[in-house]
């Protein structure tokens, strides 16, 4: 089980990313727009740098919903590999069967 502080930090990052997403998209559009003046684009770049670091969605890490484990997490289920195995063996994931060939 991951420390609770790390799990809460990830939740905070997700909240910040959602909160600043429109502002970040607007600034990036200005930066990429070649028709804008160089000063406008530069000021937009400076303003983008002033946003909180954790508002960048690339800083978010996928974690297991049950244990908070940061590695070996399957996006489709939102669970770590070992928890998927436990739950799948109990038959609690519909349509998931053990592979055999």
From Swiss-Prot:
One of its GO terms (cellular component) is small ribosomal subunit. The keyword Ribonucleoprotein applies. SUPFAM superfamilies: Glucocorticoid receptor-like (DNA-binding domain) (SSF57716). Keywords: Ribonucleoprotein, Ribosomal protein, RNA-binding, rRNA-binding. This is Small ribosomal subunit protein uS14. Belongs to the universal ribosomal protein uS14 family. The gene is rpsN. It comes from the Bacteria. Signal peptide: none annotated. It comes from Paraburkholderia phymatum (strain DSM 17167 / CIP 108236 / LMG 21445 / STM815). Binds 16S rRNA, required for the assembly of 30S particles and may also be responsible for determining the conformation of the 16S rRNA at the A site. GO terms for biological process: translation. The keyword Iron does not apply.
């Amino acid at each position: 089980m991951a420390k609770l502080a790390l799990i809460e930090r990830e939740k905070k990052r997700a909240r910040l990313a959602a909160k600043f997403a429109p502002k970040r998209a607007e600034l990036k559009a200005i930066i990429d727009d070649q028709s804008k003046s160089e000063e406008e684009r530069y000021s937009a770049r400076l303003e983008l740098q002033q946003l909180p670091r954790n508002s960048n969605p690339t800083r978010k890490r996928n974690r297991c919903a049950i244990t908070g484990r940061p590695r070996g997490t399957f996006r489709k289920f939102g669970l770590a590999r070992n928890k998927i195995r436990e739950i799948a063996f109990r038959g609690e994931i519909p349509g998931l069967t053990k592979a055999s060939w």
